């Protein structure tokens, strides 16, 4: 027997401390390792430690009590041999676990045994005489199996019970040691029904005997019975699930093992040893995930209660991916050699076709001539309006000695009329026309044959959903909020509708869907609500009065006649009305000179401011109220007044805006407290509005958008704001001059304001 080509994995380390020499050997096998330590002479200790380590590793490998043995149970003789040691060999195979692995010479004398957590495979060959060997080499009688093939059935698919139809439930007996008996057993339809496949091989699982019949790659001549047993106890596998798992792993790894053994392992061993070794065992150890081929088992390895070594006495071979789950066995879809579903026989011989005198040259008497079949599938037409199938023609020509030509035509017209005509040399048969009516839904189709009935109307088109259902939930919620705000303005507390709104509900929904929301406000009247006498008629509370003077054009503050009637511009009138309807209170006029500053609108945020400057003042106070962010730069002229830049903050970013200042002529002004009143026009995503700020009070007035959405009112609004600011400055200056008199109510800047 040749030496193994894989040696144990051991590591030896020798250390010397003073006069003491310590030898340590570490051996590994899979996930297991053994460490042996000895002291003494280096050479002797090393040899002793190595032997002990090898023995321990072998003991570890022999502790695999769940290994399974596969052993072949048949001889290669077509008839049971009467001489030789076949019986003893077969009995030994059942207990020891052998299976054929390598290629055949005269007889497949190579053997495999597989030992693992689940499997050990073995097969033995017959030691019959040369005469029996020649009989074994003869081709077995496969019979119907020669044309039988199959493929793996899809998971969950229902296949035929067997190629022979519904089989009988009785399973016949077979001799596992006789190949002829196995082949006859496999010919039974009941057996074929129960056969399965894995890895391209066919298997029949005999759970009662803990064995299976293995047909390699569907080649029925390789059929053999394999016994499955525990490699340690040599007992049968009693659990069907475990038995199926072992068989499936064997089928998946068989071709890889066989190829590696015949192409690499065996030639290498023979080259190194110079002799042909009897390495006829294969052990599959799932515990260590290794496959090893080695020589015959000795008495200890063949005995019960001992698992053969998985590494020391053999050579490792590749197995492929069999160590993980490979799945179970699958069903088989059987296929046989296709046979014609119909046949054509000439029943009207012509000219003594069956007589010897009229037999054609080269045609034996009584010979059967295979018909030549032509099938034309062209011209198939389908009309959805009704049944309209084109003709299908089959021409069959049988030439028998040159005596007879027979043509059979089957045609299907658009009216479903079937005409079959058979023409021979002696007779013609015509069959009646068969009319088929196509029934409708609950009533007969009375349409005239041959006419094209218009197709029924199709289903109605799918109705598209409303636009609200096509927008996101966030947008829908915003639309509903905007609608709620509109309805709160459009109806008063009593549920009555309010007229003169800047937009209707449809416009609110449309703008909201586009991401824009304009507040709904009540439009002001077309004329200003002023009093000819110059007195406040309501809406503005009594107070300081300079805002009221601007709104009402008070003649007492401006020095005009008491009966003068103001003539405001239309845009001013709208602003005045909005202020009065908003019930803006006025503040007391301060006795001080004022300078009005107009800021030109730029980009999205601009403001119009009024700034008061005192003599010798070196600071400027500018207030801009809006929702945008930008730089507002103003410059005031006074004694020692520098340029001051301020910044207004809001919720959206805008570009930097510049301002142009319009100031009153410089003149000596009485010193006093400075005060600022600001009117700003603001544009943002919500719309436009006018913001009025006086001191610490501020009021915003939304500007309703135009009815059509196309008219640009920006120029008019800015002109109105500028006019208000200019007038405000003049009125404040005049009020300050008049307030310097001792008898005036507004003589003191510290006078308390009336609320």
From Swiss-Prot:
<feature type="compositionally biased region" description="Polar residues">
    <location>
        <begin position="590"/>
        <end position="599"/>
    </location>
</feature>
<feature type="compositionally biased region" description="Low complexity">
    <location>
        <begin position="393"/>
        <end position="412"/>
    </location>
</feature>
<feature type="compositionally biased region" description="Low complexity">
    <location>
        <begin position="112"/>
        <end position="130"/>
    </location>
</feature>
<feature type="region of interest" description="Disordered">
    <location>
        <begin position="734"/>
        <end position="755"/>
    </location>
</feature>
<feature type="region of interest" description="Disordered">
    <location>
        <begin position="1"/>
        <end position="44"/>
    </location>
</feature>
<feature type="compositionally biased region" description="Low complexity">
    <location>
        <begin position="139"/>
        <end position="151"/>
    </location>
</feature>
<comment type="similarity">
    <text>Belongs to the chlamydial CPn_0572/CT_456/TC_0741 family.</text>
</comment>
<feature type="compositionally biased region" description="Low complexity">
    <location>
        <begin position="35"/>
        <end position="44"/>
    </location>
</feature>
<protein>
    <recommendedName>
        <fullName>Uncharacterized protein CPn_0572/CP_0177/CPj0572/CpB0594</fullName>
    </recommendedName>
</protein>
<feature type="compositionally biased region" description="Pro residues">
    <location>
        <begin position="452"/>
        <end position="462"/>
    </location>
</feature>
<feature type="compositionally biased region" description="Low complexity">
    <location>
        <begin position="740"/>
        <end position="755"/>
    </location>
</feature>
<feature type="compositionally biased region" description="Acidic residues">
    <location>
        <begin position="429"/>
        <end position="446"/>
    </location>
</feature>
<feature type="region of interest" description="Disordered">
    <location>
        <begin position="523"/>
        <end position="545"/>
    </location>
</feature>
<feature type="compositionally biased region" description="Low complexity">
    <location>
        <begin position="600"/>
        <end position="666"/>
    </location>
</feature>
<feature type="compositionally biased region" description="Gly residues">
    <location>
        <begin position="536"/>
        <end position="545"/>
    </location>
</feature>
<feature type="region of interest" description="Disordered">
    <location>
        <begin position="72"/>
        <end position="91"/>
    </location>
</feature>
<feature type="compositionally biased region" description="Low complexity">
    <location>
        <begin position="10"/>
        <end position="25"/>
    </location>
</feature>
<feature type="region of interest" description="Disordered">
    <location>
        <begin position="584"/>
        <end position="672"/>
    </location>
</feature>
<feature type="region of interest" description="Disordered">
    <location>
        <begin position="393"/>
        <end position="467"/>
    </location>
</feature>
<feature type="region of interest" description="Disordered">
    <location>
        <begin position="99"/>
        <end position="174"/>
    </location>
</feature>
């Amino acid at each position: 027997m040749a030496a193994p080509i894989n040696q144990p994995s051991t590591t030896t380390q020798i250390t010397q401390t003073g006069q003491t020499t310590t030898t340590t050997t570490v051996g590994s096998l899979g996930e297991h390792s053994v460490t042996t330590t000895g002291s003494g002479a280096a050479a002797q200790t090393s040899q002793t430690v190595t032997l002990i380590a090898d023995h321990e590793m072998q003991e570890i490998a022999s502790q695999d009590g769940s290994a399974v043995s596969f052993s072949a149970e048949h001889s290669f003789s077509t008839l049971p041999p009467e001489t030789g040691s076949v019986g003893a060999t077969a009995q030994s195979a059942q207990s020891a676990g052998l299976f054929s692995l390598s290629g055949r010479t005269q007889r497949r004398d190579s053997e495999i045994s597989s030992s693992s957590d689940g499997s050990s495979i073995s097969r033995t060959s017959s030691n019959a005489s040369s005469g029996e060997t020649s009989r074994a080499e003869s081709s077995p009688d496969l019979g119907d199996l020669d044309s039988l093939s199959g493929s793996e059935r899809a998971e969950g698919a229902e296949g035929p019970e067997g190629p022979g139809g519904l089989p009988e439930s009785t399973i016949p007996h077979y001799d596992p040691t006789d190949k002829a008996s196995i082949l006859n057993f496999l010919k039974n339809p009941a057996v074929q029904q129960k056969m399965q496949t894995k890895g391209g091989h066919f298997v029949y699982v005999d759970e009662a005997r803990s064995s299976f019949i293995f047909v390699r790659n569907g080649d029925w001549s390789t059929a053999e019975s394999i016994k499955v047993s525990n490699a340690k106890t040599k007992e049968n596998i009693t659990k069907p699930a475990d038995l199926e798992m072992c068989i499936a792993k064997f089928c998946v790894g068989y071709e890889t093992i066989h190829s590696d053994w015949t192409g690499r392992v065996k030639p290498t061993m023979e080259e190194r040893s110079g002799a042909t070794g009897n390495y006829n065992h294969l052990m599959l150890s799932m515990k260590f995930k290794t496959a090893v081929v080695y020589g015959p088992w000795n008495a200890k390895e063949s005995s019960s209660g001992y698992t053969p070594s998985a590494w020391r006495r053999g050579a490792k071979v590749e197995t492929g991916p069999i160590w993980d789950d490979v799945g179970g066995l699958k069903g088989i879809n059987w296929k046989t050699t296709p046979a014609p579903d119909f046949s054509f026989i000439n029943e009207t011989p012509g000219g003594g076709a069956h007589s010897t005198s009229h037999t054609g040259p080269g045609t034996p008497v009584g010979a059967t001539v295979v018909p030549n079949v032509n099938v034309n599938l062209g011209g198939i037409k389908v009309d959805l309006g009704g049944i309209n199938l084109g003709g299908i023609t089959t021409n069959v020509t049988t030439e028998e000695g040159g005596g007879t030509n027979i043509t059979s035509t089957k045609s299907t017209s658009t009216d479903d009329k079937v005409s079959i005509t058979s023409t021979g040399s002696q007779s013609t048969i015509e069959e009646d026309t068969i009319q088929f009516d196509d029934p409708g839904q609950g009533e007969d189709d009375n349409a005239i044959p041959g006419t094209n009935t218009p197709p029924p109307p199709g289903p109605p088109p799918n109705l598209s959903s409303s636009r609200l259902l096509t927008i996101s939930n966030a947008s829908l919620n915003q639309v509903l909020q905007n609608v709620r705000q509109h309805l709160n303005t459009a109806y008063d507390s009593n549920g009555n509708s309010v007229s003169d709104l800047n937009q209707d509900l449809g416009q609110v929904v449309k703008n909201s869907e586009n991401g824009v929301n304009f507040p709904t406000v009540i439009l002001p009247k077309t004329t200003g609500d002023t009093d000819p006498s110059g007195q406040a008629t309501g809406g503005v509370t009594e107070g300081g009065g300079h805002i009221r003077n601007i709104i009402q054009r008070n003649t007492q503050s401006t020095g005009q006649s008491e009966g003068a009637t103001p003539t405001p511009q239309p845009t001013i009138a709208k602003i005045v009305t909005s202020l009065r309807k908003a019930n803006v209170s006025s503040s007391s006029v301060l006795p001080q000179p004022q300078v009005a500053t107009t800021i030109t609108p730029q980009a999205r945020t601009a403001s119009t401011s009024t700034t008061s400057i005192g003599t010798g003042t070196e600071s400027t106070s500018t207030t801009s109220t809006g929702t945008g962010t930008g730089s507002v730069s103003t410059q005031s002229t006074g004694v020692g007044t520098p340029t001051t830049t301020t910044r207004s903050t809001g919720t959206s970013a805008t570009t930097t805006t510049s301002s142009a200042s319009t100031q009153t002529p410089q003149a000596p002004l009485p010193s006093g407290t400075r005060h600022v009143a600001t009117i700003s026009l603001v544009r943002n995503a919500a719309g436009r509005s006018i913001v009025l700020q006086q001191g610490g009070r501020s009021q915003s007035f939304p500007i309703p958008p135009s009815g059509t959405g196309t008219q640009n009112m920006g120029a008019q609004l800015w002109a109105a704001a500028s006019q208000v600011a200019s007038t405000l400055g003049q009125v404040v200056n005049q009020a300050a001059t008049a307030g310097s008199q001792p008898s005036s109510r507004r003589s003191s800047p510290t006078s308390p304001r009336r609320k």
